[in-house]
Design a protein with these regions (language model features):
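The feature captures the beta-strand-to-loop junction immediately N-terminal to the Walker
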Residues: 46-48
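Helix-to-loop junction immediately C-terminal to a conserved catalytic motif
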Residues: 61
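Conserved ABC transporter NBD signature motif
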Residues: 69-77
Length: 378
């Protein structure tokens, strides 16, 4: 059990609702959101645009007033406290650095507003700029820094007065792909060294999985699932979560047989799942939707390989760490595309070739057939 799992609850949100009312209509942005954030953890709100993650963050910061519900911070009702009394640091999508000020002055600005002594301001600014690794930039203006450096200065400004809570609203959205990877690692390092409880908002699944202690997946103003990155990825609670987090294949089937379950597909093919640790046994003699990740499948160049699904290679993509195969199979005479990830190219298999797809189903999971509707609404 990690230190965060043992930690006390820093922030508690209960039954939070937010309705934006217009002259002719209203929009419910948050619908009964409840969260507990532990001391020192990096907690991510993850979801597509319009799911309510930024509205949740703005309610925590005090920029939006909830329509109902309660926000407790360190055991104190925080719901109606104005933003300037919440001791919260925040980094926005646009870093909001003052262009006419030096880096030192940007970071020191909040401390001067708080009327700290000159000596204490210098000590704090020097310490935090060293933490973010930009000691040599103190006299420069923001326009003289790269995007990644500006992001770190915005982070330093949010941390310099030792906030009890740090809020990050899609802070990497303006950076290129390679810099995003570097900066998410830097944010994690800085957050851990500062030991500050942090709530991070993003729509980027890879970003959330790589830096978070826990993740709340949101959809349509509700929390769909809360868990560690591996729990969210490996054991999603619904088809919607499974489809949103990473790549996934969904295949309609029926579970038959005793002992090792036999999955019967609409293509009239069957595969046997051995040593299953998933929930397949609970679907005995019932229909379900098989959920399997691309890396849990394997391609054989022998189209007659036993215990497999037959298909045809449509596209082969080299992605660096993996080779992704787009395979067309048939269910009820209807074509369906599935993804299969391999460590390297399968020898002798090219676009247009017939192949067999093996399912390593030890961790495969079934969802109720009625959840198939969620795929059309993600």
């Amino acid at each position: 059990m990690t230190e965060q799992e043992n930690g006390r609850i820093t922030l508690s949100i209960r039954n939070l609702r937010k309705i934006f009312r217009g002259k002719q209509h209203q929009v419910q942005a948050l619908d009964d959101v409840s969260l507990d954030i532990r001391e020192g953890e990096l907690f991510t709100l993850l979801g597509p645009s319009g799911c309510g993650k930024t509205t949740t963050l703005r309610c925590i910061a005090g920029f939006e007033k909830p329509s109902s519900g309660r926000i407790d911070f360190l055991g104190r009702d925080f719901t109606s406290i104005p933003p300037f009394r919440r001791n919260i640091g925040m980094v926005f999508q646009s870093y909001a650095l003052f262009p006419h000020m030096s880096i030192f002055e940007n970071v020191a600005y909040g401390l001067r507003i708080r009327k700290l002594s000159r000596r204490e301001i210098e000590d704090r600014v020097n310490r935090i700029i060293q933490l973010v690794g930009l000691e040599a930039t103190q006299k420069r203006k923001p326009s003289e820094l790269s995007g990644g450096q500006q992001q770190r200065i915005a982070l330093a400004r949010a941390l310099v007065y030792d906030p009890q809570l740090l809020l990050l609203d899609e802070p990497l959205s303006n950076l290129d792909a390679k810099l995003r990877v570097y900066m998410r690692e830097e944010i994690r390092r800085i957050q851990q060294q500062a030991k500050v409880t942090t709530i991070y908002v993003t729509h980027d699944q890879e970003e959330a999985l790589s830096i978070s202690d826990r993740i709340a997946v949101m959809h349509a103003g509700k929390v769909s699932q809360i868990g560690s990155p591996d729990e969210i990825y490996e054991n999603p609670i619904s088809i919607r979560v499974a489809d949103f987090i990473g790549q996934a294949n969904f295949l309609a089937c029926t579970v038959r047989g005793d002992g090792n379950p036999l999955l019967s597909f609409r293509s009239n093919e069957t595969i046997t799942i051995t040593n299953s640790s998933g929930n397949i046994q609970s679907y005995q003699d019932r229909e379900g939707i098989l959920f399997v990740r691309p890396e849990q499948m394997e391609i054989s160049g022998d189209p007659n390989h036993p215990n497999s699904l037959r298909g045809e290679v449509k596209v082969i993509l080299y992605l660096g760490s993996v080779v992704r195969y787009y395979i067309e199979i048939f269910q009820n005479h209807e074509p369906q595309e599935i993804l299969v990830d391999q460590d390297r190219r399968v020898r002798g298999v090219e676009t247009g070739d017939p192949v067999a797809v093996l399912v390593h189903g030890q961790e495969a999971k079934l969802f109720p057939t009625e959840q198939k509707r969620q795929l059309e609404k993600v």
